[in-house]
């Protein structure tokens, strides 16, 4: 399974996402309010291999605190709701406030902060201008943009957006 792949490849970081085997894409972060012994075992196994562990999370401070208690090094904020409501200014403002508070809280308890899901060249810039993150995960949008603009140009565009924020 996934842990065997992690042990074999030993990536610098792995992000644990609460998807089931038949799920096509992520639609929520971890709910850590119940028994998490299996997840804790996976985190401990990755930590023993010196692999940074990130947990895919909704912007919920209580859940983020539990991620820290389980031994995660980082969280990856699930940005689907932000992207979905990007064109609605009221919803966007509320979402940006939630993500900002979640990011600041995570940083205050020494968790790194990543973000990802449905971020694209249109909504990424505003997100990064409002939220403190260490890295972003861009997948589908990058490949979709590359189909029309080419991979080289698309990667450069995303890097420019990120470097404006990260440099």
Regions found by a protein language model. Name each.
Residues 32-54, 91-115, 158-166:
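Alpha-helix-loop-beta-strand connector modules within alpha/beta enzyme cores
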Residues 16-23, 74-86, 132-151:
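Glycine-rich phosphate-binding active-site loops on the catalytic face of alpha/beta enzymes
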Residues 21, 52-105:
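Histidine/lysine/aspartate-rich catalytic loop segments that bind and position anionic ligands
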Residues 35, 39, 60, 95, ...:
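Aromatic/hydrophobic pocket-lining residues that form the small-molecule binding cavity
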Residues 1-8, 60-70, 115, 119-133:
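Catalytic cores of alpha/beta
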Residues 13-15, 50-56, 73-76, 110-114, ...:
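Structural preference for beta-strand elements that scaffold enzyme active sites
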Residues 1-35:
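Glycine/small-residue-rich loop that forms an oxyanion/phosphate-binding "nest" at active or ligand-binding sites
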Residues 28, 87-92, 144-167:
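C-terminal helical cap(s) of enzyme catalytic domains, especially alpha/beta-barrels
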């Amino acid at each position: 399974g996934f842990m065997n792949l992690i042990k074999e490849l030993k990536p610098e970081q792995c992000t644990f996402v609460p998807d089931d085997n038949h799920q096509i894409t992520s639609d929520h972060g971890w709910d850590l309010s119940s028994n998490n012994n299996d997840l804790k075992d996976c985190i401990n196994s990755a930590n023993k291999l010196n692999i940074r562990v990130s947990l895919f999370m909704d912007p919920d401070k209580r859940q983020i605190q539990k991620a820290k208690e389980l031994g995660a090094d980082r969280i990856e904020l699930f940005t689907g709701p932000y992207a979905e409501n990007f064109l609605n200014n009221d919803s966007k403002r509320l979402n940006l406030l939630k993500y900002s508070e979640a990011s600041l809280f995570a940083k205050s308890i020494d968790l790194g902060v990543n973000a990802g899901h449905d971020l694209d060249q249109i909504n990424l810039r505003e997100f990064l201008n409002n939220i403190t993150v260490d890295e972003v995960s861009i997948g589908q949008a990058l490949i979709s943009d590359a189909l029309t603009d080419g991979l080289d140009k698309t990667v450069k565009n995303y890097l420019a957006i990120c470097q404006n924020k990260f440099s």
